[in-house]
């Protein structure tokens, strides 16, 4: 059972000065820039939080969905959607080095890009159910655990081998899956049920709360959104933090429709349907 309590100490909530209406796709691990996209995840733009300068990384559809940033903040990995003459959707996985501007095609257009993860030297990719490792730049590729979704089922790839995880059963659909920062736990959302955490082998699955779009704040804390809709429009949403034992704290007020959080140590950033962005500064 969840209970309300203190999870994080909110020191301030600051509105980000955006060049135009946008949604936040990611915050850098160092907290010095945001990646922005549109409300439909089209395009990807870097916004420097210190000076407000922008750098367009992509104008393609889906570029703002499921963006990954390397731990040093230098490499951005994203996918672009395209359509062939039969109107079939394809995904191309790309990376760009923000320092040099060099870009790489990591996976050529495919119908079955299921998941990818980034560490300091490589990108682990699951495509058509098969795992591959792509080095970033000249670094040697490592073997990452990679979470992916295949036909609604939660999969995990460890040491190059992919297996079904789906801890709550095959009859459910899964989304918003991510590894804890220490790589020992899996966070996921079970459609229409709530947010759960389990071990890498799928054991010890436990419900954390009903929040959606969950992300890790640290190894023992998650952040998500509690949104309410009338079947067509979202009319209210707050950002919440929760410990793994289910203690939950609401971080934002009812005056803002706060959605889709992204978190690093000390900062949580969220977007609003009006195209605004805010940063919640927190301590533990």
State each model region's role:
Residues 5-284:
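Sequence signature of WD/YWTD-type beta-propeller architectures
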Residues 1-3:
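C-terminal segment of classical bacterial N-terminal signal peptides
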């Amino acid at each position: 059972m969840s209970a309300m309590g203190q999870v994080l100490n909110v020191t301030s909530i600051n509105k980000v000065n955006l060049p135009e209406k946008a949604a936040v796709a990611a915050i850098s691990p160092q907290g010095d820039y945001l990646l922005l996209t549109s409300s439909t995840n089209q395009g990807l733009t870097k916004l420097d939080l210190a000076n407000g300068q922008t750098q367009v990384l992509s104008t393609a559809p889906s570029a703002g969905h499921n963006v990954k940033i390397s731990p040093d903040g230098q490499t951005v990995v994203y996918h672009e959607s395209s359509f062939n003459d039969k109107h079939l959707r394809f995904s191309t996985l790309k990376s760009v080095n923000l320092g040099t501007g060099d870009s790489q095609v990591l996976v050529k257009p495919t119908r079955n890009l299921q998941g990818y993860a980034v560490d300091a030297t490589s990108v682990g990719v699951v495509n058509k159910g098969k795992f591959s490792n792509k080095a970033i730049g000249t670094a040697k590729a490592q073997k990452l655990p990679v979470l992916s979704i295949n036909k609604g089922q939660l999969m995990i790839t460890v040491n190059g081998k992919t297996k079904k995880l789906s801890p709550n059963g095959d009859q459910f659909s899964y989304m918003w899956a991510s590894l804890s920062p220490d790589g020992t736990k899996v966070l996921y959302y079970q459609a229409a049920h709530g947010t759960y955490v389990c071990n890498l082998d799928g054991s010890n699955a436990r419900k954390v709360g009903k929040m959606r779009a969950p992300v890790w704040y640290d190894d023992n804390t998650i952040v998500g959104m509690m949104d309410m809709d009338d079947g067509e429009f979202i009319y209210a949403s707050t950002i919440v933090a929760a410990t793994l034992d289910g203690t939950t704290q609401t971080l934002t007020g009812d005056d803002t429709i706060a959605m889709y959080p992204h978190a690093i140590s000390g900062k949580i950033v969220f977007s609003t349907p009006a195209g605004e962005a805010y940063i919640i500064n927190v301590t533990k």
